[in-house]
Amino acid sequence: MSWRGRSTYRPRPRRSLQPPELIGAMLEPTDEEPKEEKPPTKSRNPTPDQKREDDQGAAEIQVPDLEADLQELCQTKTGDGCEGGTDVKGKILPKAEHFKMPEAGEGKSQV
């Protein structure tokens, strides 16, 4: 048989977003005039003249030399250039047969 017990889940009471004091104050009419919002400094829909000015600025952006950055990154990580890897080429790794792998139970036990 499976055990059926009472659920321990209890929903949390909902909290109001604002304290009751502020809600009452917000509902009362005020004699103050509403503040006028400042117009945005830049419109989201630029005129054709503004678009042309922005496009001219984009032409001045220079693309960095990615190859030079890659070489610099390789030198900082390895202390040597990436192209130099000739010392690695041509070396033959020893066969796995030459290595003795310890069997289970051999070697020092660490307790």
Swiss-Prot record:
Residues 86-111 have a biased composition (Basic and acidic residues). Pfam families: GAGE. This is X antigen family member 2. Belongs to the GAGE family. Coiled coil: none annotated. It comes from the Eukaryota. SMART domains: GAGE (SM01379). It comes from Homo sapiens (Human). InterPro entries: GAGE (IPR031320), GAGE_fam (IPR008625). Residues 1-61, 77-111 are annotated as: Disordered.
